[in-house]
Regions:
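C-terminal cap of metal-dependent C-N hydrolases
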Residues: 88-141
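Catalytic metal-binding/acid-base residues of hydrolase active sites
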Residues: 7-8, 35
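A conserved active-site cap/scaffold subdomain adjacent to cofactor or substrate pockets
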Residues: 1-6
Length: 142
């Protein structure tokens, strides 16, 4: 049984998600339906979707597991979503920011949250492909 927290252009509403999570019905996968209509509205990107779930009742471990390992198992790709011998060398280092953030659903309704995930570094097939703050680089005077 798969209960997904898939968020696209029309399939995610706080009015349904928050009561469901409050009653113990948590998604076992978190994903997006990425297209210009969804990324330019409330969905934005996968980290924004993950951040929404952090702010409506899931803990960090639940959010990361549902987005990575549990999602990979659903599509029968045990080589993805984990760090083990023989798995694909894809890795993302995330920052958990705290502050005041706003999140919008597909019905143009919003919530305020105090947690937001931000990508610090991405490694794809063993190669650094994104480095927000240059953490993989040496300082100029080294």
């Amino acid at each position: 049984f798969v209960f997904t927290g898939g968020h696209g252009g029309g399939s995610f509403a706080f009015s349904q998600a928050i009561p469901a999570i409050n009653q113990g019905l948590k998604p076992n996968t978190i994903s997006t339906d990425l297209h210009t209509g969804s990324m330019n509205r409330g969905m934005k990107d996968l980290l924004n979707v993950m951040s929404k779930f952090l702010n409506i009742g899931l803990n960090l471990s639940e959010v990361v597991t549902a987005t990575t390992w549990d999602a990979a198992k659903v599509i029968k790709r045990n080589d993805l979503g984990n760090l083990s011998v023989g798995s694909v060398a894809d890795l993302t280092i995330l920052n958990l920011r705290t502050g005041q953030f706003g999140f919008v659903d597909t019905k143009d309704k919003k919530i305020k949250g105090d947690k937001k995930l931000e990508c610090e570094l991405t490694i794809k097939d063993g190669q650094i492909v994104y480095d927000l703050n240059g953490i993989s680089n040496k300082f100029w005077n080294e």
